[in-house]
Curated annotation (Swiss-Prot):
Entry-linked HAMAP family: Ribosomal_uS19
Biological processes annotated in GO: ribosomal small subunit assembly; translation
Entry's family note: Belongs to the universal ribosomal protein uS19 family.
Entry protein name: Small ribosomal subunit protein uS19
Pfam family, one: Ribosomal_S19
Mitochondrion found in the keyword field: no
Function: Protein S19 forms a complex with S13 that binds strongly to the 16S ribosomal RNA.
Presence of the UniProt keyword Ribonucleoprotein in the record: yes
Keywords: Ribonucleoprotein, Ribosomal protein, RNA-binding, rRNA-binding
A single GO cellular-component term on record: small ribosomal subunit
Organism: Geotalea daltonii (strain DSM 22248 / JCM 15807 / FRC-32) (Geobacter daltonii)
Length: 93
């Protein structure tokens, strides 16, 4: 279900405070665990280090990202490909 328009986008208070403190001109990376926060127009041009459960993934915010969640740009799972059929590998040799 979508979020109510009257509530507005969710942004963690501590993340918003960090953005206001840094300013738009800062090149400093802002570390965050808040994957659930929505990207607002204030974040454009800033770089965030979003935690994926293991490490921090750098995310540079552009105009196209506004309205999406931080976690969408820091994948949590590593895909190694589907397992190959062992029988077909043995026949080829």
């Amino acid at each position: 279900m979508a979020r109510s328009i009257k509530k507005g986008p969710f942004v963690d208070a501590h993340l918003e405070a960090k953005v206001q403190a840094e300013g738009a001109s800062s090149k400093k990376v802002i570390k965050t665990w808040s994957r659930r926060s929505t990207i607002t127009p204030d974040f454009i041009g800033l770089t965030f280090a979003v935690h994926n459960g293991r490490k921090f993934i750098p995310v540079f915010v552009t105009e196209n990202m506004v309205g999406h969640k931080m976690g969408e740009f820091a994948p949590t799972r590593t895909f190694f490909g589907h397992a190959a059929d062992k029988k077909s590998k043995l026949k080829k040799k």
